[in-house]
Each structure stands twice: as structure tokens, then as C-alpha cells.
Amino acid sequence: MIRDKISVSIQTLRWKCIESRAYSKRLHYGRFALSPLRKGRADTIGIAMRRALLGEVEGTCITRVKLENIKHEYSAIIGIEESVHDILMNLKEIVLRSDSYGIREASIYIVGPRNVTAQDIILPPSVKIIDTTQHIARLTKSITSDIRLQIEKNRGYIIHSSNNYQDGIFPIDAVFMPVRDANYSIHSYGSGNEIQEVLFLEIWTNGGLTPREALYEASRNLIDLFIPFLHGEEQNIDGMNNKKGSNMLPFPLSHVLTDTGETKEKIAFKHIFIDQLELPPKTYNSLRRANIHTLLDLLNYSREDLMKIEHLEKESVEQVLEVLRKRFAIDPPRN
């Protein structure tokens, strides 16, 4: 049977940047629209893009600092106003941009007295500082400051042990996430079977990438995830007839099918870090010393457990609980 008329949509899917702002060197905003989409597709794309933007876009950070003749993070340095800990926290705030991979070396060589800012960092050619006004330290005496830095480009985050100091080398908890936040919304139009949707994406970055660049990278990463499905299905995936040189899955399929204990919520909470909760520095440092690095770590503690954390006062605990209630509608249980 041949249909007399076949209705074919010739509309082309298009995207457009409808708003772009730089509120500061370290806060950029972009709003994008994608249309026309069939009903339901906007939500599918929006969920995937938000996750890719927040978790898959690469960033550049200072990951290690070397200070001569310093043994502890909370040591005081003669002639420098800040403690080692304060200097490390200031270095962590520096936003970098790099077009190359691998470990890069940088340094600071300054003679006091004077203020030291990000502008004083001697960088390799492939690395750029977004905001050179970031304060690092204040030298109060006529001393020489020689600081060595290690810079890496990566994705996600790296959490170091707070006591892992050797030969004056101090690792820094690095958050390789240039996208500070991402949201999406959907607008529907039309009626009946002709309903179509417009997807709006909002992206905030720290200046290490523009929102447009972050959108490109997240899109490429999503495409890469689906490329394997475009090739022929691998044979013998059940582990039978495993001949030398065959392309087998690198794990037992039965293990994957049964190991599904983690819930979606737990997976999401693993990727929310406590430095994103905007807690006061004293509260943040107390939680970090207790090896609480993510929201999932924090939710393993009851109210009473939080009260037992060293240097975490009752007022600080209340601040943590208030953030959990307002931002996540979570009320930790009592023992």
C-alpha cells in the first residue's frame, strides 16, 4: 500500500546564543536556545547537557606547591603575613586557562616588602591567568620568597590527604570545573500532534572557558560517548570462546548486571563538593579536616555526629544544616 501523501518536516534544528555577559573576569554567563524539538526531546538533551557541563568539561588548576624549609600547612613564615594554609587557599582561588595537557611548572620569585598577586607568577607559554589581581600573600620584611607551582589540566576533582606533606611539597585539593553552574528550561508551542519545544540552556563559568566554549566541549564529550554504538556489536561478550587478541569487554558482564547498589541520588551527591556550599572558611576547613569532601560524605553524618567534629561549633553546625535545608530540602537525622 502506497500512501497518497507523506508529511515530512523540513525544519532544521538550530541553536543560537541569545544572551552573553561577563559580570567579572571570573563570572561569565551565557544563554542558548535550541529548536525546534519534538515533544520530550528537550528534556532528554537538557539533562545530558547539564551533566556533561558540570562533570565533563576540563579545567586547569594549581595542584601542588613547594615551599622551602616548611614542614606543616599551619606553619607561620617569618616576614609573611599569611600562614602556609592561607597561601594555599589563595593559590587555589586562581583561575587558569591552558591549551595543553600534562604537568606544567610555574614559579614565584619575589623580594619584599610588597604584596604578591597572581600577576607575579612566572608561567609557561601555554598557560594564562584569568584574574591577575588575585591576592596570594603580603611580604612584610625584606625577604626573598621562592615558591614553585605545579599546574595540571584535568576534569572532575582531586582530593588529597591533609597530612600528605613531604619535603615542603603541599598538594592542593583541585576542582577542575570551569562551569560553575548550568540550568535548562523548556518552552512548548503548537497544539495537538504539532507540539514542539525550545530548549534554553543557561551556563555560568569562572572565566577559564567562555560559556560558548563550555557548550562546545560538553557537546563533543557527549558525541564521543555514543560513537561506540555506531560500530558493529562485539561478539562473544558473554566470555565464551575468548580467543587471544579478541576485543572483549574488560570485565565480567554478570558483575555489571548485579552491581547496581548505588542510587541515582548517591551518584549525584558524590559530585557536589562542600566548597560549592559557600560555607564560612572556618566551617569548611573543619569539615575538610574530618575528611568530608562531598555532599555524600556530609550526609553520612547525623546532627550529633557533626557536633562531635573537632573545632566545629554549634553555630557552624546550624549553618551547615540550614544550607542542606534551603538548597537540597534535606534534614539530617538525629541519632
Curated annotation (Swiss-Prot):
Family annotation (Gene3D superfamilies): 5' to 3' exonuclease, C-terminal subdomain, DNA-directed RNA polymerase, insert domain, RNA polymerase, RBP11-like subunit
One GO term (biological process): DNA-templated transcription
Subcellular location: Plastid, Chloroplast
Catalyzed chemical reaction(s): RNA(n) + a ribonucleoside 5'-triphosphate = RNA(n+1) + diphosphate
GO cellular component: chloroplast; DNA-directed RNA polymerase complex; mitochondrion
GO molecular function per UniProt: DNA binding; DNA-directed RNA polymerase activity; protein dimerization activity
EC numbers for this chain: 2.7.7.6
Region (Alpha C-terminal domain (alpha-CTD)): 264-335
Keywords, comma-separated and alphabetical: Chloroplast, DNA-directed RNA polymerase, Nucleotidyltransferase, Plastid, Transcription, Transferase
Keyword DNA-binding assigned: no
Domain of life: Eukaryota
Keyword hit for Transcription: yes
Annotated region (Alpha N-terminal domain (alpha-NTD)), positions in chain: 1-233
Chief place where the protein resides: plastid
SUPFAM superfamilies membership: C-terminal domain of RNA polymerase alpha subunit, Insert subdomain of RNA polymerase alpha subunit, RBP11-like subunits of RNA polymerase
Family the UniProt entry places it in: Belongs to the RNA polymerase alpha chain family.
Binding partners and assembly: In plastids the minimal PEP RNA polymerase catalytic core is composed of four subunits: alpha, beta, beta', and beta''. When a (nuclear-encoded) sigma factor is associated with the core the holoenzyme is formed, which can initiate transcription.
Record remark: domains: The N-terminal domain is essential for RNAP assembly and basal transcription, whereas the C-terminal domain is involved in interaction with transcriptional regulators and with upstream promoter elements.
Role: DNA-dependent RNA polymerase catalyzes the transcription of DNA into RNA using the four ribonucleoside triphosphates as substrates.
Protein's name in the database: DNA-directed RNA polymerase subunit alpha
Lineage of source species: Eukaryota, Viridiplantae, Streptophyta, Embryophyta, Tracheophyta
